[in-house]
Curated annotation (Swiss-Prot):
Component of the anaphase-promoting complex/cyclosome (APC/C), a cell cycle-regulated E3 ubiquitin-protein ligase complex that controls progression through mitosis and the G1 phase of the cell cycle. The APC/C is thought to confer substrate specificity and, in the presence of ubiquitin-conjugating E2 enzymes, it catalyzes the formation of protein-ubiquitin conjugates that are subsequently degraded by the 26S proteasome. CDD domains: RING-H2_APC11 (cd16456). This is Anaphase-promoting complex subunit 11. One of its GO terms (biological process) is protein ubiquitination. The APC/C is composed of at least 13 subunits: apc1, apc2, nuc2, apc4, apc5, cut9, apc8, apc10, apc11, hcn1, apc13, apc14 and apc15. GO terms for cellular component: anaphase-promoting complex; nucleus. A zinc finger (RING-type) spans 35-78. One of its GO terms (molecular function) is zinc ion binding. It comes from the Eukaryota. Keywords: Cell cycle, Cell division, Metal-binding, Mitosis, Ubl conjugation pathway, Zinc, Zinc-finger.
Length: 94
């Protein structure tokens, strides 16, 4: 028996590789949503891992670091915030 496919409508779902129900430490919005500056999640609203292992929306941490009171520190642990290399850091944590 042969089956001929006439149409195919694929549906996909994506999520960030973050702990379940985790939220941005600055805006308190889940990572599967978008930060207050953005209108849609995904490429327009990426997330950033710090070497300290804290995760933020890119826009949120950029705005935080731009304030004079932040002194370039992570808002969660006050270490100097440095963006982690995504390939090396992700393999170390797995």
């Amino acid at each position: 028996m042969k089956v001929k496919i006439l149409r195919y409508h694929a549906i996909a779902n994506w999520t960030w590789d973050t702990p379940k129900d985790d939220v941005c430490g600055i805006c308190r919005v889940p990572f599967d949503g978008c930060c207050p500056q953005c209108t849609s999640p995904g490429d327009n609203c990426p997330i950033v891992w710090g070497k300290c292992k804290h995760i933020f929306h890119a826009h949120c941490i950029q705005n935080w670091l731009a304030t004079s009171g932040s002194q370039g520190q992570c808002p969660m642990d006050r270490q100097t915030f440095v963006v982690a290399d995504s390939t090396n850091e992700k393999s170390e944590t797995q």
